[in-house]
């Protein structure tokens, strides 16, 4: 059975946030031999996820402050970064019926996102809400640079949501870690948490923490953050994103 958010796993959002960690530590680009061109996005991801997990709103000022901490390489499209940073909000508002799509679009508009990024955000909301089901079945993957959200979904669909082959191929194409995290999330939403390359297999369980890139977080703290986000999703009302959301 497809593991959509409409039928929550016993592990809640833990596999999803662990997927983000795994993608950032993927072999050949992970700590300690990370290419200098990789954007330092985990700190911004944690800052925003913590705010939403606590029930706080994230308006334009707070969003921009987090975004400004990430220095993207000159040739890297900012759209995947924006989608990844918005992922905690998308998760806690996920619905297979798309009940909150308009609200998230209003939030994106309040941030001044471009029209193309707003379209990508809406597609991403649908993909997450439907458990990664949205995509072009039967399409063949390519190796586009930079990859679009549809390219990510085409890869996931072509490999039937198998996480390890998906990440391996995306890495072979030199997709940046922020894109690996997105494609990994879409794959695990489609196939379920059983396909996650668990951090223990990558040696992450043997570290005291995930290093300064992850603000000294441990995997246990990542799990706690995932549980807090899952609690917001399971609650009676979604987390506010500010006035644009509440309207």
Language-model features: locations:
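Structured, active/binding-site neighborhoods that engage oxygen-rich ligands
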Residues: 1-247
């Amino acid at each position: 059975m497809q593991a959509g958010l409409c039928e929550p796993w016993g592990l809640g959002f833990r596999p999803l946030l662990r997927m983000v960690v795994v993608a950032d530590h993927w072999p050949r680009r992970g700590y300690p031999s990370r290419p200098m061109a990789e954007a330092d996005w985990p700190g911004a991801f944690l800052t925003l996820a913590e705010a939403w997990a606590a029930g706080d709103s994230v308006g334009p000022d707070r969003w921009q402050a987090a975004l400004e901490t990430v220095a993207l390489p000159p040739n890297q499209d900012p759209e995947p970064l924006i989608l990844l940073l918005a992922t905690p909000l998308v998760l806690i508002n996920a619905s297979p019926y798309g009940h909150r799509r308009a609200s998230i679009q209003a939030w994106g508009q309040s941030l001044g996102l471009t029209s193309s990024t707003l379209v990508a955000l809406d597609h991403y909301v649908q993909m997450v809400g439907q458990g990664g089901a949205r995509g072009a079945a039967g399409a063949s993957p390519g190796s586009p640079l930079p990859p679009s959200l549809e390219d990510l979904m085409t890869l996931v669909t072509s490999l039937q949501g198998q996480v390890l082959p998906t990440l391996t191929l995306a890495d072979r194409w030199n997709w940046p870690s922020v894109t690996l995290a997105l494609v990994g999330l879409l794959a695990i939403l489609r196939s379920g948490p059983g396909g996650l390359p668990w951090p223990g297999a990558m040696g992450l369980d043997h570290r005291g923490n995930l290093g300064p890139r992850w603000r000294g977080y441990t995997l246990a703290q990542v799990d706690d953050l995932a549980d807090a986000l899952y609690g917001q999703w399971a609650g009676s009302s979604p987390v506010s994103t500010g006035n644009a959301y509440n309207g």
